[in-house]
């Protein structure tokens, strides 16, 4: 059964549609990432589920219980929805110790039950030695663990995380993502993670929901989102993608780099074919491309290459070869499956 079930939810601010006709399910023990750029509506959708905002249309169910039915004026307050919440700034109580912060959500249980649960969460989040410390005495990673422990204390079926890694040092984020995911999976707690960081979404979630301008563009596994995007926006927003011109003719897509089998849904006519950076390789005898730009990234060099048509692709070179701007490189493009879209405007292609 779905722990979260959102049906046709809409939210407007005056004439601006923040969330448009949203349908979304989160399964038991599933981690779902809401991924989108700034202003896409992802945080608004999370707040609607949490009960911090009221939708203008739609239904929301949590653990099978209806908490929102706009048409029939059903509204369950945030504190009665049974969800945990981890805020971007952690929102810890500065005057309470670590143990007191965790204990805050357990006021309806006995003293003994509170002690047992706090001790359990301190062990789980590796905070046993920090019981009596205050938030200002903790590192960012430790504060985040306290916030997660507090959210998990009442044993919610689902935890909502609003960009929880933003305030951490970049070097610490991957470790904290792994720790948070490990804790959630150990407890079997479902979660919705709001993020604009594709690495977070792809690396941490069981499924990813890409949102843009208040509309869900695609929902699927990280692999599906990356390798089989259904819109040009998803293709360009998730991962690094270039697009080259092609033409669908019968069962083929014809491009200047080769002829490929056409996906069955594509109508005849001009298309843009997605080329991921890792699909481009240097190979003797391949089509000649001209180096327009090179960027040294430490373990690799990223080259922007211009094809004869003027379209550009990128090549990630990990070999110690050095090509100057203007050098011609023979390349091949390996496409296990073709992802192509009808010719679109630059606004559709942009991130």
Name each region found by the language model.
Residues 241, 252-351:
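Non-catalytic connector elements of ABC transporters
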Residues 25, 61, 330-332:
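ABC ATPase nucleotide-binding domain
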Residues 50:
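Helix-to-loop junction immediately C-terminal to a conserved catalytic motif
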Residues 35-37:
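The feature captures the beta-strand-to-loop junction immediately N-terminal to the Walker
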Residues 82-84, 88, 92-233:
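ABC ATPase nucleotide-binding domains
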Residues 22-33:
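Pre-Walker A (P-loop) beta-loop-beta motif of ABC nucleotide-binding domains
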Residues 58-70:
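Conserved ABC transporter NBD signature motif
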